[in-house]
Amino acid sequence: MPTNKTRKLFLAITIAALSTGLAFQRPQTPPPSRDLELSVRGDMFAGFAGDSAALDRAMNACEDALARDPKDAPALVWHATGIYFRSGVAFRSGDIATGTQLLAQARKEMDEGVALRPDGVEVLIPRATVLQSQAAHIPDPETARRVLQVSTNDFEKILKLQADDFANLPLHSRGELLGGLAEGWNGLGDTEKARAYLTRITKELPKTPYAEKAAAALAANSLPRPMGITCIGCHVNYNKK
């Protein structure tokens, strides 16, 4: 059974981004299929909340999709997200060997998914979000920095892909993306870039919780880590498909 700390890690960060990630997408021709996401989302999120049977169903659905097409990028990324969760459970139970093995497998699958669809926001968002979360829990500073750099680069690419339509995206999507960038650059030690994104939040998202938190961070003598800019107003219905 996942600990409260494990559940908070994935519910507060991974679920928030994955459940809103497709709202970041620009129109594509043809648009990416959401069939898999719609079929596994409820079970995956319920699994992150502690329902192991639901997580098993979601993982089996991903594995069935990959059996049909090993290059199904969304299936790879969703499957990898579940494996990341299982790796965290293993680590916290003291099974370091299994946790390490699962962590490596998850990163491999997630990277493969992004390589197959490098401009697919539906695969970039999960990797960016999960890696930002992972980096915050890596004890080795250099390893954490490398992981966080990949995450932040993904967020930058997502912003570039969304540039033409950014103002029309939902408030939550804009806030989470700009907040993710501010958190990423702050974690990497580039406070100038972090402050630039915080300032952008205050200007483009005025009178919102994102702007309030960004303004508070900017007013501090030094930027806190983390700043708590992301995962604002997230609500998940695990049974909604």
Task: Name every feature range the model reports, one short phrase each.
Residues 227-239:
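The canonical Cys-X-X-Cys-His
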Residues 219-227:
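Short, flexible, mixed-charge glycine/proline-rich loop motifs
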